[in-house]
Amino acid sequence: MFIKNIEIPKLEKDDSLLFVDNDAIDKGKVFGAEDKDAFDILFSRVKTEATTDVKVHAAKMEQFLSQFKFNENARMLSVVVHDDLDGQSLFIGHVGILVPSEDGYLFVEKLTFEEPYQAIKFATKEDCYKYLDTKYENYTGEGLAKPFIMDNDKWVQF
């Protein structure tokens, strides 16, 4: 399994926004068929409503992600983006892993397929949440909710 610390159930998937990811996975032979299917399920679009109310969208994302079993020590932090190009949906626009270190937390992320992974050290989880919130705050548009952060299956509220 490509993500050893997350149990991914067999769910219906909507991988329509994952064409770039799946192309890179196929070209790089990154995953076998089973792992690619799990990837597509975890990062599926989630249906939502036409509202700018982040609470509404966060509740939908919490419900979706509650079907997965996450590791509490290696936390999946996700930036969730609202999209209305083909119906109202939510998708994980960026993801990284947060792990405790001796004097804080280490956040590991990959910004693009072409760039190497990067690791950033934070004193607190909240500092990492703020970093993500600030970095992705403009990934929105007119009539759309602002991006929000999920820590495993829980909405991070500031």
PLM regions: where:
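Glycine-rich catalytic cores of cysteine/serine-nucleophile enzymes that process amide/ester linkages
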Residues: V81-Y131
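Low-complexity, Gly/Ser/Thr/Pro-rich intrinsically disordered linker/tail segments
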Residues: F107-K110, E114-E115, A123-F158
